[in-house]
Amino acid sequence: MRSVIPVKTTLTVLTFAVLLLVPQGIPSLKNYMSIEPKSAIAVVTFPAKPAAAEALVDPLASPAGLSQTVNKRLLAKAPRNLSDPAHVLDHFYAALLRGEGVHIIHYGDSPTTADLITADARALFQHEFGDGGMGFVLMARPWAWYNHRGIEMSGSNWKIDVSSTSNSKDGLNGLGAVSFRGAPGAVSRWKVKTAHRSVELAYLVEPQGGTFVVEADGNPIGTGSSTAGAGERPFTPGYASFNIPPRTAEIGLKVTSGSVRFYGADFRKGAGVVYSSLGINGANVTLLSNAFNEAHWTAELRHYKPDLIIVNYGTNESGFPDFVDSTWGREMRKVVARLQRAMPEASILLMSPMDRGAKGVHGEIDTIPTMPRLVATESKIAADTGVAFFDTFEAMGGSGTMGRWYTSEPRLVGSDYIHPMPAGARIVGELLFSALREGFNQFKLEQLNQNIVRQADRTGQEASQQP
């Protein structure tokens, strides 16, 4: 009996099956898995007994029909509260798909300073795509609440300069916007909870710098100098990398002579996701638009090569209505322009602030009036400049969320109705990860759909040429 299924459709379905099943058997292709085989029936099963009104057209009777079906699923899986019409996140998604190494940097204010939100997003990304290491951390704690989950740090005898309240005013404070000037007697220590392969120290190259020694559990593993050497330009970032011996519990640094202006330490394991949390207490958008020296910041960004740059400001500014309405948008546009000049290939994501509550005259906790305006402004900036936008405000529940969070059990926000408790921060971190994970799934399905259509076209042409 002659098959009732057209040749092209048969070839297309077989191609789809190969694309679906091959990654299951070849570990190196695991990141190309879009759905489990047991779920494939939802995509390719023919209707058993369609109703008369629906039986006129078989949606899978041609490659074009199959393509339309897959595209409908893509639309259905579009990430919520994540807007990326220019597909700027495709660079980030492609890096995840390659499964080699992916670097995310996340600029923010107080919650990011404490590694709230970012720690939970980091854990989820590293669980899903591999743990590439702790990433960039500061030399010591500029504030008591500075934190990076998975590492304990301490330091002494440093002169600390923060870009947002800088005394030097030169804007040369490294990737994390904080520098640490030290002479002999200045020390830093980092205790990592899991083994890392290497640590790279960043500092300012100077005409007359200083020297330092790096130790693993008290034993020297290398030395470095911040004095400009042959081919090095003074007042540019410098880097010194050291391999970490197996089973090392603590990395230490000591300045041994002169004076060194350090920026931070970058801990790496290898392939996987690195998620660097770059929070500054009390920071606002002008940190990136004005306080950073642009050439210096560009050099730092190009060295660390982030695949995704998240800019997450607005909470502190939302308390100043005049600034929000007259200046904030202009400053954020400057930030985006700086980033696009520095890293034209990187994915850039503007992440809106969370809700911010205030107690009303009758004791109710309402969203402050400036917050929806600020979020709307940021959304428009993202659309105008061709970067992605994650609407944290709407994702967490929109207006009135902090009031609901404050009265929930357990309480999800502090008594200022601004700073999330760890459980609240976890929710936001999961929302961010979920949106990007859904975007990644959509990206994979789009790649799969394109492969199906291309393969169907090729096999159809071959079949038509057969005698």
How does the language model describe each region?
Residues 107-110, 277-281, 311-316, 351-355, ...:
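Active-site-proximal beta-strand/loop segments in catalytic clefts of secreted hydrolases
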Residues 80-96, 288-302, 330-338, 373-375, ...:
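Alpha-helical scaffolding within the catalytic cores
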Residues 305-318, 326-341, 349-389:
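Conserved N-terminal glycine/acidic-rich loop preference
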Residues 113-330, 419:
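Conserved SGNH/GDSL esterase-like catalytic core that processes O-acyl groups on lipids
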Residues 8-27:
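Hydrophobic membrane-insertion alpha-helices, especially the h-region
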Residues 294, 355-467:
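Catalytic His-Asp segment of secreted/periplasmic serine-dependent ester chemistry enzymes
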Residues 115, 119, 123, 295, ...:
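Solvent-exposed, polar/charged alpha-helical surfaces in well-ordered, non-transmembrane soluble domains
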Residues 28-73:
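Juxtamembrane proline-rich low-complexity "stalk" or linker regions positioned immediately after a signal peptide
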